[in-house]
Amino acid sequence: MIRRIADKSAAQGFLRSRLPELTSEEVKLIQGTSDFFGLNHYSTYIVYRNESAPETYPVPSYDDDLDTIQYQLPEWKIGSSNATKYVPWGFRSLLNYISHQYDYPPILVTENGFATHGGINDEDRVTYYRGYLNALLDAIDDGVDVIGYTAWSLMDNFEWANGYTERFGLYEVDYNDPNRTRTPRKSAYVLKEIMRTRSIDPNYEPDMNQPLTIDHGH
């Protein structure tokens, strides 16, 4: 990537690469200083090199710099957003890749979640979290040092790229209500049960008529 962006920058008339290189002194200064590897992950893409179609993307741009075509298979059906197609094996594979590539660092999953267009009975999100958490456990069994996991997100929010059109929250936010009422989705009950029992029960069905509370000690 460093060489590719340098070559593209020269061809585009830049005096130097748009991706500044670290000096040897800077590399030495930061080497070994990280406490953990923070990972945001949502889904998986199939990727292949595409140097033969230089006008596929705007120039210069992130996508043009990659020189790749990315796509997802039609059987990855669950998910209203391409960013959150259900591919749990890709999560396990990525965790193993990072572990092997970077000398087995502690990995903190800082974002992982699923987008819908709203609704309380979010069965697809429940399927997603169960599948991805099982994949994470498989990666731990593989020897990956996972030290933490954060679900994205606690409640619906304004997403950088898609505004309010995609909902990631465990809690649904009513944006038509001036009080922005929050209501727990089924996924909130399921994740609470996973944390309470420290296990993933594929058959657990919550009673959503009961209020979702924080239990003492859980």
Task: Describe every region a protein language model picked out.
Residues M1-H218:
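Non-catalytic scaffold segments within catalytic domains of secreted glycoside hydrolases
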